[in-house]
Design a protein with these regions (language model features):
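Amphipathic alpha-helical linker/stalk segments
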Residues: 124-126, 145-154
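Charged, amphipathic alpha-helical coiled-coil/dimerization segments
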Residues: 29, 57, 79-137
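N-terminal leader segment of winged-helix/HTH proteins
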Residues: 1-39, 133, 141-144, 153-155
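Conserved amphipathic alpha-helical interaction elements at protein-protein interfaces in regulatory
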Residues: 34, 38, 54, 80, ...
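N-terminal helix-turn-helix DNA-binding core of bacterial DNA-binding proteins
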Residues: 19-22, 26, 30-70
Length: 155
């Protein structure tokens, strides 16, 4: 294989890491839909609810940091969850700048169904427990870099 063929092979979309991640992410999110629709949740709302099931009340900042979402993304999600009667948002009496998120009784009632979904998704992925753990660790390593990201050159 000559050098040009090698370069073209590396450029092929199916060989791109970003395309593999994009395709896998889309598939996994689609796998969630039949489980989330009966709960009235979108995938991002589901992630917020899982974060809240770990303990409440929590600040918007804490949830955003855990999920890697900024306030501009998280606030509309929380407004929709609040409109659905699943969460409440209140100002922290100790620090008015902070907004506390808590589960309502309706939000708590979804806990068992929502918390059973990750296991169903893992089963649908048809990977061994070891492969799932390795994949999760690898993806977390990409999502949460251990050190500063190197400067990318665009030339």
């Amino acid at each position: 294989m000559d050098n040009n063929s090698n370069i073209n092979e590396r450029r092929h979309v199916a060989r791109q890491l970003s395309f593999a991640l994009y395709s896998a992410s889309n598939r996994v999110i689609r796998l969630h839909r039949p489980f989330l629709e009966p709960l009235g949740l979108t995938y991002p709302q589901f992630l917020v609810m899982l974060a809240l099931y770990e303990g409440t009340p929590r600040t918007v900042g804490e949830v955003g940091q855990e999920l890697g979402m900024d306030n501009g993304t998280l606030t509309p999600l929380l407004k929709r969850l609040e409109s659905a009667g699943l969460v409440t948002r209140t100002r922290d009496q100790q620090d008015e700048r902070r907004v506390l998120i808590d589960l309502t009784e309706a939000g708590k009632a979804l806990r068992e169904a929502a918390c059973s979904i990750p296991e169903k998704i893992e089963t649908a992925c048809r990977l061994s427990d070891e492969d799932l753990a390795e994949l999760r660790d690898t993806l977390n390593g990409l999502a949460i870099p251990r050190q500063a990201t190197p400067t990318l050159h665009t030339t």
